[in-house]
From Swiss-Prot:
Name of this protein: Flap endonuclease 1
Alphabetically ordered keywords of this record: DNA damage, DNA repair, DNA replication, Endonuclease, Exonuclease, Hydrolase, Magnesium, Metal-binding, Mitochondrion, Nuclease, Nucleus, Phosphoprotein
Classification of source organism: Eukaryota, Fungi, Dikarya, Ascomycota, Pezizomycotina
PTM notes: Phosphorylated. Phosphorylation upon DNA damage induces relocalization to the nuclear plasma.
Similarity comment: family membership: Belongs to the XPG/RAD2 endonuclease family. FEN1 subfamily.
InterPro entries in the record: 5-3_exonuclease_C_sf (IPR036279), Flap_endonuc (IPR023426), HhH2 (IPR008918), PIN-like_dom_sf (IPR029060), XPG-I_dom (IPR006086), XPG/Rad2 (IPR006084), XPG_CS (IPR019974), XPG_DNA_repair_N (IPR006085)
SMART domains on file: HhH2, XPGI, XPGN
């Protein structure tokens, strides 16, 4: 799930933190990818007539189809992917996982009912909601990656947190995930939409944590407190607290402790904090997640030549894939993983350090830009209010 509305908050209040561009712009870069999130998206997206793809034996193959062809697209564009798999979820995440499981059970029942009485649209909608990534899906994807020569590692707990460790250490350029909570784990750069299909034509979003903090005017602790208030995987959100209110509360009070104190002492009881809301434990999980250090031997990885015959046996013989397509894919892998060895030009040059005067000038321009955006929003809100107050038919 990640952090609710965080992308909206960053793009509106720290626009300089977000860059969008084509996948080819990341040629020559190593990227750590949240595997479990990717597999989940493959199970939802890679379908035929609203149903997951199946082998002749009735086994789901959507995850393998997605992993094979989306990884090929990444490698075709000169990127060297490293996949990171989730380990056991933190205990605090249990409540959220239980809720998701209950929602999936309800969706499964609704899906069965839609089969009997509903439209094809209803069936597809409820079918997507029943999707969950199983241990078997993960193990089959690991087997496929090994045959492709693409490395993967297992995280002790959260894959996003391990991706962030590797990015901070410079072992990869960025962490790639659709989950915005990757930024809470201090990933310097987050890439989104990297494993999307080419048909979706979604640009790659590149979000820089330092610029997000600068634009929001927050330190990392305040940023994490904001994310907890927005709603994260560890805690349910406070009812009636949306993105604008969450941002206002953190800016006004500076920390979750003071926000909670203000809410509980409010005689009007405008907001009510859930009975079981251990925000300090959630904050600790973001600050000190269970991860392996970047220099741990289990975090070593390298790209190798694909095992062509192994791929044929697994994908073609066992799973019913097209042999021509698999052989073609293996050839592309072998060729493009070699070309991805070429360094980006930026690797040969050290960035020139800005003077204090230049930094002050950039900050002034940034502040002016933020003020201009706020002014424009106020004017737009005022215009909307006036338009609503105007009688119908009045000019």
């Amino acid at each position: 799930m990640g952090i609710k509305h965080l992308y909206q908050v960053i793009s509106e209040n720290a626009p300089d933190a977000v860059k969008t561009g084509e996948i080819k712009n990341h040629f020559g870069r190593k990227v750590a990818i949240d595997a479990s999130m990717s597999i989940y998206s493959f199970l939802i997206a890679v379908r035929s007539d609203g149903q997951q793809l199946m082998s002749d034996a009735g086994e789901t193959t959507s995850h393998l189809m997605g992993m094979f062809y989306r990884t090929l697209r990444i490698v075709d564009n000169g990127i060297k992917p490293l996949y990171v798999f989730d380990g056991a979820p933190p205990k605090l995440k249990g409540g959220e996982l239980a809720k998701r499981s209950a929602r999936k059970r309800e969706a499964h029942e609704a899906h069965e009912e839609a089969k009997e009485t509903g439209t094809a649209e209803d069936m597809e909608k409820f079918s997507r909601r029943t999707v969950r990534v199983t241990r078997e899906h993960n193990e089959e994807c690991k087997k496929l990656l090994k045959l492709m020569g693409v490395p993967y590692i297992d995280a002790p707990t959260e894959a996003e947190a391990q991706c962030a460790v590797l990015a901070r250490a410079g072992k990869v350029y960025a962490a790639a995930s659709e989950d915005m909570d990757t930024l809470c784990f201090e990933a310097p750069i987050l890439l989104r939409h990297l494993t999307f299909s080419e048909q979706r034509k979604e640009p790659i979003q590149e979000i820089h944590l330092d610029k997000a903090l600068e634009g929001l005017g927050m330190d990392r602790k305040q940023f994490i407190d904001l994310c907890i208030l927005l709603g994260c995987d560890y805690l349910e959100p406070i009812p009636k607290v949306g993105p604008n209110t969450a941002l206002k509360l953190i800016r006004e009070h500076g920390s979750l402790e003071k926000v909670v104190e203000a809410i509980e002492s409010d005689p009007k009881k405008k907001y009510v904090i859930p009975d079981d809301w251990p925000y300090k434990e959630a904050r600790e999980l973001f600050f000190n997640p269970d991860v392996r250090k970047a220099d741990d031997p289990q975090c070593d990885f390298k790209w190798e030549s694909p095992d062509v015959e192994g791929l044929i046996q697994f994908l073609v013989t066992e799973k019913g894939f097209s042999e021509d397509r698999v052989r073609n894919g293996a050839a592309r892998l072998a060729k493009n993983l070699k070309s991805a060895q070429q360094s980006r030009l930026e690797g040969f040059f050290k960035p020139v350090t800005k003077t204090e005067a230049e930094k002050a000038s950039l900050k002034r321009k940034h502040d002016e830009k933020i003020e201009e955006q706020k002014k424009r929003k106020k004017e737009e809100a005022k215009a909307k209010k006036e338009a609503k107050a105007r009688p119908r038919g009045a000019v």
